[in-house]
């Protein structure tokens, strides 16, 4: 949140759904996910958020916890680039560490550019369910 990039749990989405709508090459800024990272994030989050009333999560700064989890993930999890074409889609676990790789100079895309539609539906449950559900 903000210019200091403070981490706060403002959205409790169920998953991330990516749907490519244009054609582009594999190195055109692919989605990157760290395999198994959701388990590490869940461990760190459970340890931290169990001390806080779920109604207060949205205002709690968990930046330090997030960075500690992320550092462990970078050290222990395999980085995987995800590529899909129109007609395909992918789902990412809500707690998986993910990002977008830089555009490779050799990458190509259709005239419309690289367009992927992302959906992050809310998890319509009690806040603590976000932490305890698989």
Predicted regions: what they are:
Residues 1-4:
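Short acidic (Asp/Glu) patches
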Residues 6-9, 17, 31, 41, ...:
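Generic detector of leucine side chains in alpha-helical contexts
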Residues 8, 78-81, 108:
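Short, solvent-exposed segments of well-ordered alpha helices
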Residues 8-25, 86, 118-121:
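Short, conserved beta-strand element in jelly-roll/cupin
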Residues 12-18, 28, 79-81, 97, ...:
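Extracellular structured ligand-interaction cores
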Residues 20, 36, 94-96:
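Short, well-ordered beta-to-alpha junction loops that form the rim of enzyme active sites
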Residues 24-91:
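Double-stranded beta-helix
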Residues 43-46, 86, 90-91, 95-134:
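Non-heme Fe(II)/2-oxoglutarate
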């Amino acid at each position: 949140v903000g210019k200091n990039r403070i981490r706060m749990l403002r959205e409790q989405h169920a998953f991330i759904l990516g749907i490519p709508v244009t054609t582009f090459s594999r190195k055109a800024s692919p989605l990157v996910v760290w395999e198994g990272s959701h388990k590490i994030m869940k461990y760190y989050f459970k340890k931290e958020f169990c001390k806080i009333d779920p109604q207060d999560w949205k205002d709690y700064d968990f930046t330090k916890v997030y960075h500690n989890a992320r550092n462990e993930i970078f050290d222990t999890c395999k980085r995987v680039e995800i590529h899909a074409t129109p007609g395909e889609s992918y789902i990412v676990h809500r707690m998986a560490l993910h990002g977008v790789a830089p555009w490779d100079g050799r990458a190509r895309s259709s005239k419309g550019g690289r367009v992927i539609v992302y959906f992050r539906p809310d998890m319509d449950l009690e806040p603590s369910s976000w932490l305890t559900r698989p």
